[in-house]
Swiss-Prot record:
Site (Reactive bond for trypsin): R41, S42
SMART domains reported for this sequence: KU
Subcellular location: Secreted
Tissue: Expressed by the venom gland.
Organism the protein comes from: Demansia vestigiata
UniProt cross-references to Pfam families, sorted A to Z: Kunitz_BPTI (PF00014)
Superkingdom, natural source: Eukaryota
GO cellular component annotations of the record: extracellular space
Protein name from the UniProt record: Kunitz-type serine protease inhibitor vestiginin-3
Length: 83
């Protein structure tokens, strides 16, 4: 392979490594759950970990059911899920 081809391959591999998201395999299971507002009708502001965007975000929790990917503060979300 020519040196130009090797440089192109190296550049593509570097770009791929930079753009590939960090694996979520090391995240606690609750952080992989989708946000789940539940069926009730309260309008409570909570935080959840968005495992696609790799960050904590707000959502409105209905006040019942839902799942464990629900935190009162962004600090609690980050300390549990943020990498």
């Amino acid at each position: 392979m020519s040196s130009g081809g090797l440089l192109l391959l190296l550049g593509l591999l570097t770009l791929w490594a930079e753009l590939t998201p960090v694996s979520s395999k090391d995240l606690p299971e609750i952080c992989k759950l989708p946000k789940e507002p539940g069926p009730c009708r309260s309008y409570l502001l909570y935080f959840y970990y968005n495992s696609v965007e790799h960050k904590c975000q707000t959502f409105h929790y209905g006040g019942c059911e839902g799942n464990e990917n629900r935190f009162h503060t962004i600090e609690e979300c980050k300390s549990t899920c943020a990498e």
